[in-house]
Design a protein with these regions (language model features):
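Amphipathic helical "hinge" segments at domain boundaries
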Residues: 34, 38, 47-114, 118-121
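Hydrophobic alpha-helical
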Residues: 128-131, 196-257
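Structural motif
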Residues: 96-117, 168-169, 214-235
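Hydrophobic alpha-helical segments within soluble ligand-binding/sensing domains
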Residues: 158-185, 221-231, 249
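Flexible loop/hinge segments that line or gate small-molecule binding clefts
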Residues: 103, 121, 125-170, 191, ...
Length: 257
């Protein structure tokens, strides 16, 4: 198998120095004459040369890559957010690497180390899990952004997402205003800050003294289906069901029809 062309090959074919080729590909073309730029471009095209992003990141201690960690890449909401982020990054000349944590703390910690090894320009955490490693990372790096799940207490970092408590509160208040009976909350894991905030908001919106059946489950369609099956099979009645996210709601709807 032929070796990929190098910067030296481009310099040799174009008749310029390797320093000139390096300046051109590192975005410093203003220091290179138009004639030499044209020669470098022709040589690179003829050889099929592309600069090494790894080599560039080692030289600059930073890459053009932004790493996004997500809890479940199969979730429609997660996919929509990832596509939007990638589109925005492309507009400013950056690329994105998407990695799945599977809602596992150890996997998230390993991926944080991978991002550090890649010299990622920034890390976007959707559905972050509070771990000592994450806290260490937040303390050492400024380019971390939390999405959809707020950073835990003591971690100062930018957050993009909704007010989960207020969202739950609005639904609870709506239930009361509409006269819905037998409220049920099928919510996400309690150890996730967003899940807790949504549930607490919902209970607050219902008001003191409200009796609410609660089911804790994963943020998946199957989990929502299983909870609804258990509820409807054992006690057939009319329920007003609050679902913590759309995937749980899809599962509940499938069980109810």
């Amino acid at each position: 198998m032929a070796k990929p062309p190098t910067i030296r090959d481009v310099a040799r074919l174009s008749g310029v120095s390797t320093a000139t080729v390096s300046r051109y590909f590192s975005g410093k073309a203003d220091a290179v004459s138009p004639r030499k730029i044209e020669s470098v471009q022709r040589a690179a095209k003829a050889l099929g040369y592309t600069p090494s992003e790894i080599g560039r990141s080692l030289r600059l201690s930073q890459s053009r890559v932004v790493m996004m960690l997500v809890p479940d890449a199969t979730n429609h909401f997660t996919a929509d957010v990832a596509v939007s982020v990638e589109s925005a990054l492309k507009e400013i000349g950056l690329s994105m690497v998407l990695a799945n944590t599977g809602e596992k703390a150890a996997q998230q910690d390993r991926l944080l180390s991978d991002a550090q090894g890649l010299r990622a320009r920034a890390i976007i955490l959707q559905g972050a899990i509070d771990t000592p490693r994450l806290r260490e990372f937040v303390a050492q790096h400024r380019n971390l952004i939390f999405v959809n799940r707020m950073p835990a207490s003591g971690m100062a970092a930018p957050y993009v997402g909704i007010d989960n408590f207020q969202a739950g509160f609005s639904v609870g208040k709506y239930f009361v205003e509409r006269g819905y009976i037998n409220p049920v909350a099928i919510h996400g894991p309690r150890h996730y800050s967003g899940s807790t905030a949504r549930l607490d908001g919902f209970l607050g919106g219902l008001g003191e003294g409200a009796r609410v059946r609660q089911f804790e489950c994963a943020y998946t369609m199957q989990a929502g289906y299983d909870c609804a099956q258990s509820l409807l099979e054992n006690e057939p009645a009319k329920y007003s069901i609050f679902c913590a996210n759309d995937m749980i709601a899809y599962g509940v709807h499938r069980a109810a029809v």
